[in-house]
Amino acid sequence: RRRILMYYKPEGEICSAHDPEGRPTVFERLPPLNHDRWVMVGRLDINSTGLLLFTNDGELAHRLMHPSNEIEREYAVRVMGEVTPEIMLNLKRGVMLEDGMAQFDDIVEKGGEGINKWYQVKLKEGRNREVRRLFESQGLKVSRLLRIRYGSVSLPRELRTGRYLELDRREIDTLAGLVNIRPRQGTGLYGIEIGRAHV
C-alpha cells in the first residue's frame, strides 16, 4: 500500500540517507519498512526546519518534486533587514539568480520586532536554497526558515520537531491527485492488494 509520512525536521539534521561526516540525518528517526524504502520528497538544508514528506512510492515522490507539476510550497521565514515595498515587488516579479529566474508567488508580512520580521512566502518549485537566495539577492539575510506546507499537506500544530505522523488514506489520495496519480485499490480479506492504480 502507498504510505506517506510527514516529518518535522529539526535544525542540524541533513537530508541524506548517509553522511560521511557522521552528522544526524532525517532518515534516522523514521519507522523501518519491510522490503521497501522511504523516498524523500524534496529537501531542506541543514539549517532549515519544518515539513518533510517521505513515501514508499518512488513515482509519486518524483512527480511531487518535478517542476512541471508546480506543487506549491509555503514557508515561514524570519528575515534580518528591511523588506521595502520595492523589494516585495522585485521578489514577486522575479529575480535573476545564478540558475535562472526565480520568484515568490506570494509574500506576506507576519510581524516581528525590530530588524527581525517574519514573512510567509509561497513558491511552486524547490531549487537548492531558493528561498534564502531570493532574499539574499535583495541584500537580506534569512535567520530562520520553516516549511509549513507542501501541496495539500500542512505541518500540524501538534507535531513536535523530530517526530513524524502518517497520512491517512484520504490525505494520501488528495496529495496523489495533485499529480494525477489515482488512488490505489482496496485490499482483500488478507490485506493483499487486489489491484494497483495504473499511472
Q: Which residue stretches match the model-derived regions?
A:
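Basic, flexible Lys/Arg- and Gly-enriched helix-loop patches that mediate nucleic-acid binding at interfaces
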Residues: 1-196
